[in-house]
């Protein structure tokens, strides 16, 4: 296992808790009821439900004002605001309630250029499955406009379900993490998947 992959795992699982290989660019059709959210540095875009609020590289927002009493969301927004933050986009569904927001984030990190997609997929799946509290992990390979993608679905703790997409693009790895309550997982599963399948780089 590479040091970069090992160091990234605690950050990925931390983002899940706080939140409550490269290919050519394909054309993207934005689903009805969604709109495209674009981040300029690094350059990528992803479609989200129109009602969702999102904050990216040009966000200058008061985290306390936006998050209210939701400590998890506030911490994530404060992390986003740091210049060295691996988080590049944070979004949430304001209709989900203030104690737990259904949410997503996009993390960008570098990976060794020699690390193949298959090796990356095995490493990420193994490391997350070994993490404390993670259960019911399911793995699937898919493809989004940005390239070949690993999709993992799992429960990081009681009353939460995560859908996570690992997109390799050159020597960069983009991780799209969608989190909701266990009781809402079936309702949001298609929304998360439709969103992830619009992700493109550049």
Residue spans for each PLM region:
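N-terminal targeting sequences that direct proteins away from the cytosol to non-cytosolic compartments
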Residues: 1-84, 96, 179-202
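Conserved polar/disulfide-associated segments of primarily extracytoplasmic proteins
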Residues: 30, 54-170, 174, 180-184
